[in-house]
Amino acid sequence: MLSNLTAEQKNSLQTMQAVLGLAADMAHGMVTIYLPCEDKKFVYVYKQEQPRTQRGSVRPDLTGRRIRLVEEPLVARSLQKNMPVRGKREWDLGVFNTMEVFPLRDGRGRSYGAISFETSAPDEIIIAQSLELLSNMPQSLVDNEHYKRMEPSDGIMVVDPNKLIIAANNRAKHMFDVMEIPQLIGCRTNDVAINWPLVGMVMETGTAESKEFNM
């Protein structure tokens, strides 16, 4: 497993592990990193995180466990094909979650593992941003206070380069509904009703910032 990885691949895993919990919180779903075992019939759970932003029952943490590959057909397909895979997974009897699996690739495009997002209410844009965080997080920022774990009371919005809000979680929508902005997606952060100049500043500098405000 780890002994077969290059230094680049190991460094990437260490960085991802540091912010895996935050990615789970953002995606409102369980996030798991899988690595191939020497025995091709098994896969190794390198790290697994449950979201703090979602209340309810959670599964046992499988970190450090070996799992038969036949029990994870979506993971097997992603590892074999070096491509993203989407499907359903039974959470409980008759209850299914959406599971999306993405290959982990190094700088040469070689697949050395897979990462899955499992959630009952997937938002493709927010999952994509969570994956972006994991894939491109600089090691120097993993201890930055702005990248701490989230809570159920935290709102999430995804803003495009034009300051257009293209995705938001239910908490963010509720927060702005109280401010009489019932349709948050499609608004701009520089609209008069929202007026968040901090977003534009972060886009210009590429540096995370924070500011407290009353709603």
Residue ranges and their predicted role:
Residues 2, 18, 43-55, 76, ...:
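N-terminal membrane-sensor/transducer module of prokaryotic signaling receptors
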Residues 8, 62-64, 89:
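A generic structural signal for short
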Residues 10-42, 161, 178:
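Helix-loop-beta substructure at the N-terminus of cytosolic sensory domains
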Residues 21, 75, 170:
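Short glycine-/small-residue-rich flexible loop motifs, especially phosphate/cofactor-binding loops
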Residues 30, 100-101, 155:
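Conserved beta-strand and immediately adjacent loop positions that scaffold enzyme active sites
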Residues 36-37, 42-70, 135, 144-147, ...:
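PAS-family sensory domains
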